[in-house]
Amino acid sequence: MGILGLSKLIADLAPQAIRESEIKNFFGRKVAIDASMCLYQFLIAVRSEGAQLATVNGDPTSHLMGMFYRTIRLLDNGIKPVYVFDGKPPDLKSGELAKRAERREEAEKALKAATEAGDEAEIEKFNRRLVRVTKEHAREAKELLKLMGVPYVDAPCEAEAQCAALVKAGKVYATATEDMDALTFGSSKLLRYLTYSEARKMPVKEFTYEKLLQGLELNQREFIDLCILLGCDYCESIKGIGPKRAIELINSYRDIETILDNLDTSKYTVPENWNYKVARELFIEPEVADASAIDLKWTEPDEEGLVKFLCGERQFSEERVRGGAKKLLKSKKAQTQVRLDSFFQTLPSSPNAVAAAKRKAEEAKKSANNKKAKIGGGGGAGRGRRPK
């Protein structure tokens, strides 16, 4: 699910935190990619005549087709991807998973009704809703990546949290996912639409964590509380509080505890036994592997291994697979080129660095306001940060 309404809230209140770019602008960058999100996209999008691609035995291959060609496209553009796979979900996510199971059951009933009615559009719609990534899909994707010479990481828990840890450690430039909670986990950069097909012509949307904190006038902890109010995977949200009201409350009271002390409970219903404190801790200290100990290596592809794995039973075109393997080899050799900024040291990001950048921005803002006052500048008061 990610964080409900966060993307629009940032666009409205901190537009300076978002930049749209062409994929080629990320040449030379290492990027941690949410593998489960990608596989889900491929299972839905890579289809023939409305159905998933499959072997003669009916086993799906859409996820492998998508992973193979989209990864080649990234490498063609000089991007070095590392795929991060989900581990076990945290216990606090069980409520969200139960809701997903209910929605799946409803979709199955709707699909049955659409099939009986012969409504092809509805059949396709509900078939897509029933798509889910299995352990077998993930296992096959890992085998494919190994043959392609592309590294992957098995996260102990949430993939987005592990991606954020790799970014913080300076191992990669950004997290690539469609789930906004990568920012809640503290990833300094988030890339959306990076793995979309070229045909969709979607520019890559880059979010910068420090700039969104400055634009929203929040620190890391306050931003996490905002995300919990908006709605996350780990606990329910307060009914009746949408994005606009959530940011107003955080700006006024700075944390959920103080909000609850001042909330009009005749208007808003707080969930019973609300686990917001545990959710907050999951975002602050998620279960991740030590990123500094992870060694990321991009190696040469195994062309014969790829042909054996993808052709035959999986029915990929041998000519196209060999062509893809040659592109992989070519991009591996081309990666000797480097970005100019790679000559400078990349330091791991930290909450202290974010706070320092924020203080610097606030000091610059105060200085500018003082200068305006001296020369008589001014129309009304600007939007200031309320005291904690």
Curated annotation (Swiss-Prot):
EC class of the enzyme, as a word: hydrolase
Residues noted as binding DNA in the record, renumbered to the chain: R47, R70, E158, G231, D233
Cofactor needs: Mg(2+)
EC id: 3.1.-.-
InterPro entries attached to this UniProt entry: 5-3_exonuclease_C_sf, Flap_endonuc, HhH2, PIN-like_dom_sf, XPG-I_dom, XPG/Rad2, XPG_CS, XPG_DNA_repair_N
Function as written in the Swiss-Prot or TrEMBL entry: Structure-specific nuclease with 5'-flap endonuclease and 5'-3' exonuclease activities involved in DNA replication and repair. During DNA replication, cleaves the 5'-overhanging flap structure that is generated by displacement synthesis when DNA polymerase encounters the 5'-end of a downstream Okazaki fragment. It enters the flap from the 5'-end and then tracks to cleave the flap base, leaving a nick for ligation. Also involved in the long patch base excision repair (LP-BER) pathway, by cleaving within the apurinic/apyrimidinic (AP) site-terminated flap.
Family from the record: Belongs to the XPG/RAD2 endonuclease family. FEN1 subfamily.
Subunit structure: Interacts with PCNA. Three molecules of FEN1 bind to one PCNA trimer with each molecule binding to one PCNA monomer. PCNA stimulates the nuclease activity without altering cleavage specificity.
Protein name per its UniProtKB record: Flap endonuclease 1
Lineage: Eukaryota, Metazoa, Ecdysozoa, Arthropoda, Hexapoda
Gene: Fen1
